[in-house]
Amino acid sequence: MKDPFTPNELKVAVIGGGTGSFTILSALKEHTSQIAAIVNMADDGGSTGVLRDELGTLPPGDVRQCMVALSDSKRLRDLFNYRFEEGSCSGHALGNILLSALEKSTGSFAEAVETASDILRINGTVIPATLDNVRLKMEWPAASYILNGERVIDANYFKHDPRKAGLSLLPKPTVNPMAVQAIEQADVVLIAPGDLYTSLGPLLVIDGIGDALRRTDAMVVYVCNLVTKDGQTNEFTVTDHAAEIERFGGGSFIDYVIYNNQQPDIQLAARYKKEKAFIVKADKEKLSKAHYESVGGSFLGHIVEHEVGDNIPATRSLIRHNADAITDTVIELYDTWIKREPSR
């Protein structure tokens, strides 16, 4: 088994899906090359969903985004992100097709990821959380209500409180041992922003991930989402988000929560209001009593518009975190942490 890190640099394991991890990884690679991106493998929407259904391959989309974020070559990044605009490949990113082709030709998704990483010359390691072909299930036992599939769950307007639902992957997966090793060996574990129920939850519920998070000596940081999601996390506060993260992982493991306290400009606020999405509120009284420390700041980043050629239905985030500000904050926290916890 390949070692996710080499010595003598800050070692960071980033846990997440595609968009949230991409944002963080793009800035983090400027500070260290010892990065392990642990990636959700339950995606079945958009281009990824079509390739899974038609080719029987594992989901490439989130893995591609993480690899692209860690590449220093703009030409290769653009190539892997290129989306076809016409023909039978319309809506597909070239990187998704390449990863699926490599998996089919080698018979191994792990080998496909390693080969594509070599092509992109990435700084770091991209680690699928599991190498099993799984689908996401969300179940409210008390209501006898079940939703199946990441795409279905992502688009659903929940009839019941999601905090009373259980998340699971079917069939029950085996954790990728490299993911556990990365969490255990890291100096910092960074849980990236992302959809609670279709991006972060499906990764954290894999047996072995939560145990590793509780066992690690690393500083564990959760970067809270910027906005709520209509029909799913309406009125969720910062502590609500953090509580769900730890529920998925089976117990307490967060040391710091980073959250945004900057308000968007009027135009951006109006665009979000149309989608009934609002800046996540910091419930400061609850935060002051939490077992973790919290750090608020101005973390709003740039607006991202719909990609050209991206015509396969999928949800794309409108705004990103200011990744440079997030990364600087994490490094400052670690400098304080290591002085306070010298044995770690």
Where do the protein language model's features map onto the residues?
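C-terminal functional extensions of proteins
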Residues: 235-344
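Electropositive, gly/pro-rich neighborhoods at or near active sites that engage anionic ligands
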Residues: 42-161, 313, 317-321, 325-336, ...
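Non-transmembrane, aqueous-exposed alpha-helical and coiled segments at domain scale
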Residues: 2-11, 29, 33, 121, ...
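Active-site gating loop/helix substructures
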Residues: 136-193, 197
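Gly/lys/ser-thr-rich phosphate-binding loops in alpha/beta enzymes
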Residues: 1-61
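Charged helix-capping and loop-helix junction motifs
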Residues: 203-210, 236-241
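Short glycine/serine/threonine-rich phosphate/pyrophosphate-binding segments
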Residues: 19-25, 193, 198-205
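A short helix->loop->beta-strand "cap" motif at the edges of active sites that frequently abuts
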Residues: 32-33, 216-220, 254, 292
